[in-house]
Amino acid sequence: MKASLGSIVREARELFRHHGYDGASMQDLATKVGLKKASLYTRFPTKEALVPEVLILTNEELFAELPEGDPLAAYALVLERIARGLSQEIRCVGLHLAYGASGPDTPDAAVAVRGFFTGQRDRLAALIAPSVGEVRARELAGDAIARLEGATVWTVVEGDVEPMARALRLSLEEIASTPRR
């Protein structure tokens, strides 16, 4: 069976999401995608090499097919996608990788993790900056991500998705009530 790069990256994302960086193994990934471990290493020389690809894919999915001509609707849609993903999957692959693969032993992964979150913030901010200004847009986007990511605590420890719904609602209310330029 010949596994596509996309299928390898998607399966790696699920392993990272559910087992963290340290708990995910190249052998487990090879087994999941139907490859020998040696074949997997010809495509990705290290586990760390998968991290940027996993995070790029995740952000590409979040920002895919946004409504044109309505940046506020696009902003809301991305936040809804983040909230839905975190509620359904329970764990954020970005946070798992931030805790497990962002130290001096994994410098490329650390750069990718930082880029994942700052990239989300900056792309969200770019959507709303024409309406609220660059500084305020960056604050709103950063706060929204922090709220949504923080709400995963209650999804994980109590199975309660209501804090996620409130975090989304508060983030959308905040942008709606921010004075326009």
Question: What residue spans do the PLM features occupy?
Answer:
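Hydrophobic/aromatic residues within well-ordered alpha-helical segments
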Residues: K47, V54, T58, L62, ...
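Hydrophobic alpha-helical connector segments
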Residues: E53, A64-R91, A141-A144
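Short, charged helix-capping/linker segments at alpha-helix termini
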Residues: D22-G23, P130-R138
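Amphipathic alpha-helical segments used for helix-helix packing
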Residues: L86-R114
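Solvent-exposed, charged/polar functional surfaces in cytosolic regulatory/catalytic domains
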Residues: L57, E61, E65, R81, ...
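Amphipathic alpha-helical packing segments from all-alpha helical-bundle domains
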Residues: A73, L77, T106-S131, G142, ...
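Helix-turn-helix
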Residues: S7, E11-A49, E53
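Amphipathic C-terminal alpha-helical segment
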Residues: G85, I145-P163, E174-R181
